[in-house]
Amino acid sequence: MEYNPIKKVVSGNYAAAYAALHARVQVVAAYPITPQTSIIEKIAEFIANGEADIQYIPVESEHSAMAACIGASATGARVFTATSAQGLALMHEMLHWAAGSRLPIVMVNVNRAMAPPWSVWDDQTDSLSQRDTGWMQFYAENNQEVYDGVLMAYKVAETVNIPTMIIESAFILSHTYEVVNMIPQELVDEFLPPRKPLYTLTDFENPIAVGALATPADYYEFRYKIAKAHEEAKKVIKSVGKEFGERFGRDYSKMIETGYIEDADFVFMGMGSLMGTVKEAVDLLRKEGYKVGYAKVRWFRPFPKEELLEIAESVKGIAVLDRNFSFGQEGILFTEAKGALYNTGVRPIMKDYIVGLGGRDFTVRDVKAIAEDMKKVVESGKLDKEIEWYHLKR
């Protein structure tokens, strides 16, 4: 069957819901929280209208939502959930249980700033604070990537048995409508066949225990296997991304999407929706004579250090745009990028720009101002400061 996209004008949240529908998820357990709520409302609408054969489990909290997802996934079901900010934080214990149990749950997290003070706007700190739980993380630039990301996440997660977050920006994507090219169900089914679990709690001929006690003689190897699965996931991500591109014309074979790096003196590096702004600004800056490119990190976990090294070898500087902050240190992507390059001996000059916290606007004008600053840094070979809180009111 030839691929002819079904074009729908949808929000990022609706794109996530349609992707869950097309992935033929069997169980959804979730608790509503702004700005995630409309994902679950749309799925409930699919069920009420008879469009979806999904077991929906209403729960009293996000902790319970993930607990229900863990139980359902352990029976062999394809499971979906969604959350945001404080809800994700409440799930924290269960995120470890899902990853440690090697359950390929897919969750959409709508990036929202952590309270207090209360905020419902975009900020990556909620998802990045869960980076050590064992979940893979994919950051979507636009609504199309939300839809595509969910479909690819199931194929990757079910291959390596690691749960996966697809992460979108609050309101900038979650409640903003744009055209999304959806895939006919028959073609999704060809790309994403039913899950074939390694084990299930319902295989009574081969009984298993999940989450049992491991003594010091055994625990270490369990951690090692998860670490190895994340390394293996890099190959699977690239393979699945390439296959997706061949089938549907949107290539995801690179964990870091790049542009104009062939002759760039420096690049902007960041994740998520802000990279759409960066791309527009870079096009304008190139016309003005700036030798600048971009590197959009799609997958933060597993971290694509091999692709980062290739980029770092070709440029003099990297301006890291962090819509997050780790108190007592620096922006989280900045830390990861520096650490990945340290033992390679490849050391382009790097500066961390803290931008857009709590949903503060990040515009083309801002990118241009940062480009001017980074140009001076690269030309002088000296940092005036390592961390720039760009948006501070002065």
From Swiss-Prot:
Domain of life: Archaea
CDD domains: TPP_PYR_PFOR_IOR-alpha_like
Enzyme Commission number(s): 1.2.7.7
Gene Ontology biological-process entries: organic acid metabolic process; response to oxidative stress; sulfur compound biosynthetic process
GO molecular function: 3-methyl-2-oxobutanoate dehydrogenase (ferredoxin) activity
InterPro entries reported for this sequence: PFOR_II, Pyruvate:ferred/Flavod_OxRd, Pyrv_Fd/Flavodoxin_OxRdtase_N, THDP-binding, Transketo_C/PFOR_II
Class of enzymatic activity (EC top level): oxidoreductase
Subunit structure: Heterotetramer of one alpha, one beta, one delta and one gamma chain.
Protein name: Ketoisovalerate oxidoreductase subunit VorA
Species for this entry: Pyrococcus horikoshii (strain ATCC 700860 / DSM 12428 / JCM 9974 / NBRC 100139 / OT-3)
